Amino acid sequence: MLFLLSPAKSLDFEKPAAPVPHTQPLFIPQAAELIDILKKKSPRQIASLMSLSDTLAGLNVARYQAWVPKFTAKNAKQAVLAFNGDVYEGLDAKSLPVDDLKWLQDHVCILSGLYGVLRPLDYMQPYRLEMGTKLANPQGKDLYQFWGAQISDYLNIRLHKNAAPVVVNLASQEYFRAVDRKALQARVLECVFQEYRGGQYKIISFYAKRARGLMARFAAEHRLSKPKQLEGFDAEGYAFDAAASEPDRLVFRRQQPLS
């Protein structure tokens, strides 16, 4: 099984990279092509394109200008340790032993507007480029057209040795849309996380994002290899609800968050 995650807007490049293994990103030429486009834009253009404040636009313009195609410990950090949003707080990779990080490296792919796909231990330089950004490029009007079938082709390569390939989608719709489903040669499982509120179960964004990270951590800690094993997920009070689930849509529910 291969697990897909979204990246995070929030980054942590203040703390030094941990003394754990690292790898180089897979799609550096493509990232460099996008950076070249972004480098030509002014802070005002970036603010408009990405709906950012002037401060954030200025920060990211500086990031684009500083970006180079050589990734080192001085300018980059392992992706799973650099991302700092709700998903990654749930995953809490910094507290995992190296063996678990290596398992994540072999079984998790982080989708990225700039880098296409990042393995957890791939070095990345700081950036802001959401997959839904309408950044015109030689391939089309947005990043979905830029990446085309490249991401699904890579996932197929990763899965080709599996007799029954399965992708567990823990990414958002915005990011999973970058995967060409027609080209993807795998069964796709969706995991849905719901909270009990006002007499009914519903998805609450903050908790759902955190739960995606918790599921990835659970998979690493328990070395999950079969879809049935996903049903054992019980972190922070969640439990599998068979009645609410479908074969390719697994629903996990809880009454209230654990304090």
UniProtKB/Swiss-Prot annotation:
One of its GO terms (cellular component) is cytosol. It holds the Pfam family H2O2_YaaD. It comes from the Bacteria. GO terms for biological process: response to hydroperoxide. Belongs to the UPF0246 family. NCBIfam families: PRK02101.1-3. This is UPF0246 protein Rfer_2372.
